[in-house]
A protein has these predicted regions:
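Transmembrane helix-bundle segments that form internal channels/tunnels in multi-pass membrane proteins
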Residues: 1-74, 78-82, 243-255, 259, ...
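Membrane-interface helix caps and helix-loop-helix hairpins in membrane proteins
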Residues: 20-22, 272-281, 296-300, 317-327, ...
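Membrane-interface helix/helix-cap signal primarily in integral membrane proteins
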Residues: 54-223, 533, 537-541, 545-549, ...
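Aromatic-rich juxtamembrane segments at the membrane interface
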Residues: 155-285, 292-293, 422, 568, ...
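Core dinuclear metal-dependent hydrolase active-site scaffold
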Residues: 315-316, 320-322, 440-548, 552, ...
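Metallo-beta-lactamase
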Residues: 550-561, 659-663
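Active-site HxH/HxHxD metal-binding segment of metal-dependent hydrolases
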Residues: 554, 558-593
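Cap/insert and terminal regions of metallo-dependent hydrolase folds
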Residues: 643-718
Length: 754
C-alpha cells in the first residue's frame, strides 16, 4: 500500500474520535482487530485499506482510553506523586507531568494542572517536586458555540487538575530553557516591545498586554504570536540557508542539499524545545520530519500527497491531536493554499518586480482570508474586515524582519558581543513599533457573525470551483439552487407559538435566557472573577451567536454570582431595561404584584414584598412566566424562610410546569412544601461541579425526584434548553443529548456534589 493511501486511512480512522458518544470497550476493539487481521489476508487495495483503517481506529480508541485512565484511577483521594513542572506563573498556577506515583513510574507521564503555592523554593519550569495532591478529573462548562475546555484539556494531554496540599523540592534547579528565559527577560527590560519579542521568540504570551491581544484579534493577526509552523519553518529555513552558505567555502565534495536539509530539521527541533515544546510546535516538527523523509526518499511527491502524509503521521503519533483546534486550523490553512494555487493560480509572466511580489502577496493573503472563513467563523464567531490589509503589513514585517532579528539576537545572547546583541534587539523593537503603529491606524474591523453565516462561509470554495468549471454557464439552475440553500438560514423563522428558556452553564452562578421571535430577556447574569465575568465570556457571545437581540434583564438579587456579568451585558446592549428588587437607579421594580407582558408571554413577580429594599438570598426576585399553557418559576436564591412566607401569601400562583431550583440546590432551600406547591414536571439547577458547598445537595435532588420531577443540572447536562410550543414542551441538554461526545462526559466518580 502506498504511503499517501496509508496516511489517508490514518486520517479517516482518527476522525470518529471527534463524534463518538462513548468509547468502544475491549470486546468491541478485540472484534475489530480480529476482523482487520482477517481482511489483511485477502487481496485488493480496497480491502487492505479497510483493514488498516480498522486497526488504526483501534489504535486511536486505545489512545483515548489511555488518556482517560488517570481520571478513573488517580482521583477521589489524596495522592503523593513526583511532578516535573513544565510551565508556571511563579505563583499559584502550575502545569507539569506526574512521573511517579507512590514510588512507581507512570508511563506515559500524566499531565496535570495544579493550583497552590510552592514554598520555600520559587517555582520554575524543570523543577522536580514531591507533592501531596488532591486530584480531580478535568471538568468544563459546556455551552452551544462556547469554548470546549474539556476537549482542549484532553488535546493537551492534561486530564487532571488539583490542589497542592504539601510539596517539597527534590531538585529545585530550573531547566536550561527556564534559566535562558530568565536571562533573556532581564536583558529585555528596557525595550518597550519586550513582551511581543518574548512571545515571538520564546512562545511566552502570558505577559502580553490585553490591549495588544485585542488589537491583534481585531486585525486578524493573532496567528503571528503563536509558535506554529510559520515560525518553526522559518527557523529551519534560516539554518538551512546558513549551512548552505558555509558549504560554498568548502571543497566540492562537501556541497550537497541533504546536510542543510537535516540541519534545518535539527534547528527546528531545537527552536521548538526553546519555545517550550508545546503540542503545536511538536506537531510542526513531526510534519517537517515527514517532509524531510519524503524529500530524502528520492521520489516525486505532489503537494496533496505531502499534506496527507504529514497529517496522517501527526494523527498516528498523537491520536488525541484530532481534538485540537489549532491542528485543524493549520491543516486547513495549508490545504486551502494548495487548493487556491492549483485552482486559481496567478498568470505567469504578466508583471515585473516589484509589482509581481506585491500581487503575489495579495493573492496569497486573499486565499488564506477567504478559504479559512468556515473555520474562523466556527471557532471565533466572527471575521476581521481589516485582516487582509493588516496581514499584508504584518506578515512580511514579522517573518522577514522581526523573527529573523529576534532569533539571531537569541543566538548572540548566548556568547556574542553585547553591542551586536543590543543592536539586534533594538532593530527588532523598532520593527515591532512600526508594525503596531500601522495596526493601530487601521479601523476596528472585527465583525461578529451568528450561526446563520456558517453555510454561506463555504461560498468562496464553491465560487473557485464554479469559476474553474464554468458552472455558472453550463448549470445556472444548479448554481442558483446551491445559493438558495446556503442563504436558507436567513429566511428560516421559528414557529410563531414557540419560545425557549435556556439555562446557560456558567459554573457556580445563574444565567438564564428567555427568547422569542428573535428577542431575548436575561434572568441573572452569572458570576464574575478577577480577570473577567460571565457576561463577557459566555452570555454576550452566546446571544450574538444565536442572533438574539437583548431587550431586558431581570436581576434576582445583588450577590456576585448572579449579577457578575451585568456591566458587560449593559455595555453591549445599553438600551436594555433592568428589573430588580434592589431599588438601584434606573432599575424597574420587581416586587410581589408586578405584572407585565413581553412578546406575548405573561410575567408575574411573586417575591419579595412591595417596598422591601433588604438584600440577600431571601429577597430574591421570584418571577413566574407562562404562555397560557406551560409555565416556569424562576426563584433566584430564596431559602426556606422566604419560601414559607411566599407560600403563605401567594400559594395559588406557584403551580408551574418547571422550576429553577432555588439557591443552586442548597439544603437550605427547596423545602418539601415548595416542591409540593409548585407541583412541576422538571427541575433545573445551576451549579459548578467542584463548588465548595457541594451543591446541589443529595437530599434536595431526592426530594424533587420523589415528587415526580425530572432532574436536570448544569454540571451533568451542561447548557439546558426548554422548548415550549403548542404541542407541549421538550428539554434538550447539551452534554448528553445535543452533543453527546466521549470527551464531554462526567469523568471520574459518579457524583462529586451532594
Amino acid at each position: 500500500m502506498r504511503l499517501p493511501w496509508l496516511a489517508g486511512c490514518a486520517i479517516i480512522a482518527m476522525l470518529p474520535l471527534l463524534w463518538l458518544p462513548v468509547l468502544p470497550g475491549p470486546y468491541s476493539l478485540a472484534g475489530a482487530s480480529a476482523l482487520a487481521l482477517a481482511l489483511i489476508r485477502l487481496h485488493g487495495r480496497a480491502v487492505a485499506g479497510v483493514a488498516m483503517t480498522l486497526l488504526l481506529v483501534v489504535w486511536g480508541v486505545l489512545s483515548a482510553h489511555q488518556a482517560l485512565w488517570p481520571t478513573r484511577h488517580l482521583t477521589g483521594a489524596i495522592r503523593q506523586a513526583e511532578v516535573i513542572l513544565s510551565e508556571t506563573d511563579g505563583q499559584t498556577l502550575h502545569r507539569g507531568q506526574m512521573v511517579r506515583l507512590r514510588g512507581r513510574y507512570l508511563f506515559p507521564p500524566v499531565g496535570v494542572t495544579l493550583y497552590g503555592e510552592l514554598a520555600p523554593a520559587p517555582a520554575c519550569a524543570g523543577q522536580h517536586w514531591l507533592m501531596t495532591l488532591r486530584l480531580r478529573p478535568v471538568h468544563g462548562q459546556l455551552n452551544d458555540g462556547g469554548f470546549d475546555s474539556q476537549r482542549y484539556a484532553l488535546a493537551q494531554h492534561r486530564p487532571l487538575s488539583g490542589g497542592i496540599v504539601a510539596a517539597s523540592a527534590l531538585d529545585a534547579r530550573c531547566s536550561l530553557r527556564a534559566r535562558y528565559l530568565t536571562s533573556l527577560t532581564r536583558r529585555l527590560q528596557t525595550y518597550p516591545w519586550r513582551a511581543v519579542m518574548l512571545g515571538l521568540g520564546m512562545g511566552e504570551r502570558l505577559s502580553l498586554p490585553t490591549e495588544i491581544k485585542v488589537l491583534m484579534q481585531n486585525t486578524g493577526t493573532s496567528h503571528l504570536m503563536a509558535i506554529s509552523g510559520l515560525h518553526i519553518a522559518l527557523a529551519a529555513s534560516l539554518i538551512m540557508l546558513l549551512l548552505r552558505g558555509v558549504q560554498y567555502i568548502l571543497p566540492g565534495r562537501w556541497i550537497g542539499w541533504r546536510l542543510p536539509l537535516v540541519a534545518g530539521l535539527a534547528g527546528a527541533v531545537g527552536y521548538a524545545w526553546l519555545t517550550g515544546m508545546q503540542p503545536p510546535a511538536l506537531r510542526t516538527c513531526l510534519g517537517l520530519a515527514v517532509c524531510c523523509a519524503l524529500r530524502l526518499s528520492g521520489q516525486r511527491w505532489t503537494a496533496w500527497q505531502v499534506w496527507l502524509c504529514c497529517l496522517g503521521a501527526i494523527l498516528v503519533a498523537d491520536p488525541l491531536a484530532v481534538l485540537s483546534q489549532s491542528l485543524w486550523l493549520s491543516a486547513f490553512a495549508v490545504a486551502g493554499l494548495i487548493f487556491w494555487f492549483q485552482w486559481l493560480p496567478l498568470p505567469a509572466g504578466r508583471w515585473r518586480w516589484p509589482w509581481k511580489t506585491i500581487i503575489a502577496l495579495v493573492h496569497l493573503q486573499a486565499g488564506v482570508t477567504l478559504l479559512l472563513l468556515p473555520l474562523q467563523l466556527l471557532l471565533f464567531h466572527g471575521v476581521s474586515l481589516t485582516s487582509m490589509a493588516a496581514n499584508l503589513l504584518a506578515v512580511p514585517l514579522v517573518t522577514l524582519l522581526a523573527v529573523p532579528l529576534i532569533l539571531t539576537a537569541m543566538l548572540v545572547h548566548l556568547s556574542g558581543p553585547d553591542i551586536v546583541e543590543s543592536l539586534l534587539w533594538l532593530a527588532a523593537d523598532r520593527v515591532l513599533a512600526l508594525l503596531f503603529w500601522g495596526l493601530r491606524r487601521l479601523p476596528d474591523g472585527w465583525l461578529t457573525l451568528d450561526a446563520r453565516w456558517l453555510w454561506i462561509s463555504i461560498l468562496p470554495w464553491l465560487l473557485v470551483m464554479g469559476w474553474r468549471f464554468q458552472s455558472w454557464r453550463h448549470s445556472p439552475a444548479l448554481c442558483l439552487s446551491v445559493l438558495f440553500l446556503l442563504t436558507r438560514p436567513f429566511s428560516r423563522q421559528p414557529p410563531a407559538d414557540e419560545w425557549r428558556v435556556t439555562m446557560l452553564d456558567v459554573g457556580q452562578g445563574l444565567a438564564m435566557v428567555i427568547e422569542r421571535h428573535g428577542k431575548a430577556l436575561l434572568y441573572d447574569t452569572g458570576p464574575a472573577w478577577p480577570q473577567g465575568d460571565s457576561g463577557q465570556q459566555v452570555i454576550i457571545p452566546w446571544l450574538r451567536w444565536h442572533h438574539l437581540q437583548l431587550q431586558g434583564i431581570m436581576l434576582s438579587h445583588e450577590h456576585l454570582d448572579h449579577r457578575g456579568g451585568l456591566d458587560s451585558v449593559l455595555q453591549a446592549w445599553p438600551q436594555a431595561w433592568v428589573r430588580s428588587p434592589l431599588g438601584w437607579a434606573h432599575h424597574l421594580p420587581c416586587h410581589r404584584g408586578e405584572r407585565w407582558q413581553w412578546q406575548g408571554l405573561n410575567f408575574q413577580a411573586l417575591w419579595p414584598l412591595p417596598g422591601s429594599t433588604a438584600k440577600g438570598n431571601n429577597h430574591s426576585c421570584v418571577v413566574r412566566i407562562d404562555d397560557g399553557r406551560s409555565s416556569i418559576l424562576l426563584t433566584g436564591d430564596i431559602e426556606r424562610q422566604a419560601e414559607q412566607a411566599m407560600i403563605s401569601r401567594y400559594w395559588r400562583h406557584l403551580t408551574s410546569t418547571l422550576i429553577q431550583v432555588p439557591h443552586h440546590g442548597s439544603n437550605t432551600s427547596s423545602s418539601a412544601l415548595l416542591v409540593r406547591r409548585v407541583d412541576g414536571a422538571a427541575a433545573l439547577a445551576s451549579a459548578s461541579r467542584y463548588n465548595a458547598w457541594r451543591m446541589p445537595s443529595y437530599k434536595v435532588v431526592q426530594r424533587y425526584r420523589l415528587r415526580g420531577y425530572r432532574w436536570f443540572a448544569t454540571p451533568q447536562q451542561g447548557q439546558i434548553t426548554v422548548v415550549f410550543s403548542a404541542e407541549g414542551w421538550q428539554i434538550h441538554s447539551l452534554r448528553d443529548q445535543v452533543l453527546p461526545r466521549w470527551y464531554h462526559q462526567w469523568f471520574g466518580a459518579p457524583a462529586d456534589n451532594g
